Amino acid sequence: MRFLDIEWGSSEAKGDGNLKDYFYEFPGFDMIMKGNYRYIIGRKGTGKTAVIEVVKSKVDKDPLAFYAEMSLKDFPITILKELRDKGFAGKAQYVPVWEFLILSQICRTIIYKDNGTSSIESVDDLRRFYEDNDIENLSATQTLTVMKERNSKFQISALLKYLQSTVGFDKKKSMTMVMDIHYQKISLAIKELIKTIDTQSVYHVFLDELDEEFKSGDKSNKTLILSLLRAVENLNTYFADNTSVSFRPLVALRSDIYNTLQDDNDTNKLHDFIFKLDWSIDIKDTKDTDMSIINIINRRINFSDEGKNCSWQDIVRDDAPDYIRGGIWSYITSRTFSRPRDVIKYLKICQDKKPIHDLSFRNVESSESVYSEWFYNEIRNEIYTHLPVWDECLNVFRDIGYFRTTKDEFIRRIQTRPRVNKYLQSSGKIADDLIEQLFNFSLIGNIDDKGRWSFKYKDDDALWNNEADLILHFGISKKFRLPTYRR
């Protein structure tokens, strides 16, 4: 098996036709499939979307399982805010509109994808409601736009009898009456109708790309995400307690966004339903059932060799010099955030160099500049909304010419930069706040007198030590043309 012949896959999980064949089903994946976990938390690049894509592929093969999708990408947040229930405060004001959108996705799935329900009359009523209002084929985004155009109201006719049992409408009124009703009452009617549906089917709803519209420091967007989580929990409880319909939501959320929600009491209640994509880079004594990136790599190597049980050792000539501790694997992974995307990207760049046979240290070292440029751009996409002057701060290491510096020297240098000073003044922050934020994003770490270093991505509980020296992440060092080891 040649390193050159390995199929590493697409950079994006969506649209990767082979993903289901070489996906590594890590410990806990089966619990996600069963609905025991309904929130996937992880940094960008840890595989959240890949998990959803593989779950979707498995659902497609199950005749009694169906799914719908919701995404915040290009989502009209402004409209959602306009449709809030002004009678409530905080996250509670947005919960009703989220519930209506999610319910609508479930209903469309029941009507147009599942032919196995025995409650024909109820499903026909549901279908008539969506078709009478011309909203049968709309996405959540399109539904929201229509809600604004219609002042939050829809024709109730097909659902009137279900609404009567919940809010006490006059039962003498015609069941065919056409009237415009607020979407919150429509939600009540739909919930009542769903109680009458008898089905063995399972309905999945996937909510992804919630980071697309998230901006750090925007309290209203934070409230929107909290309200979405509340809506998911409300519906999950309702379906479990009041219906025979199996509802399985799966929400993918970036860890830096999730961390901003920790001051809300509701997040503690979600603990048992959260799966965190925390990958290990261990390679020694690693079992093929461990949550280690090497198992992802081996799965793709084995797939490329048509199941002949080839692995990392079969495609690498580990000729790294003695001063490189841990060999080629350690050299590569120390330049990542311990994310599958980073490791796979580095290997794909190495492959572009077209090594003759096995992967050698020479290939890895010569590919580092291209990888470091890519890694730097990945960081920009993740941190910019949280810390716009991150690049100015990191350029201190370029000025110094080395990957390590003292805290005092770092502060002295960033305070000479006009853009950083302007940001500090406008945000009310001090230099220590910038360092701590860089540490929390693992762009810098701590290093002690014995050369032991600490990064947040290695230990989520790690705290910045303001008495230790600062060290730049090795993945950025080549971008700045800095040495990362001494020969």
Residue ranges and their predicted role:
Residues 89, 93, 177-180, 197, ...:
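Short, solvent-exposed segments of well-ordered alpha helices
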Residues 11-12, 72-73, 318-487:
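C-terminal leucine-rich, beta-strand-based interaction scaffolds used for sensing/assembly
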Residues 184-206, 210-321, 325:
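The catalytic "switch" region of P-loop NTPases
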Residues 1-92, 469-487:
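Walker A/P-loop-proximal flanking segment of P-loop NTPase domains
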Residues 96-111, 295, 299, 345-348, ...:
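Short, hydrophobic/amphipathic alpha-helical patches that form generic packing surfaces
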Residues 83-88, 220-223, 264-270, 350-353, ...:
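Short secondary-structure boundary/capping segments
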Residues 16, 21-25, 304-316, 417:
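Flexible secondary-structure boundary motifs
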Residues 43, 49-204, 213, 258, ...:
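P-loop NTPase nucleotide-binding core
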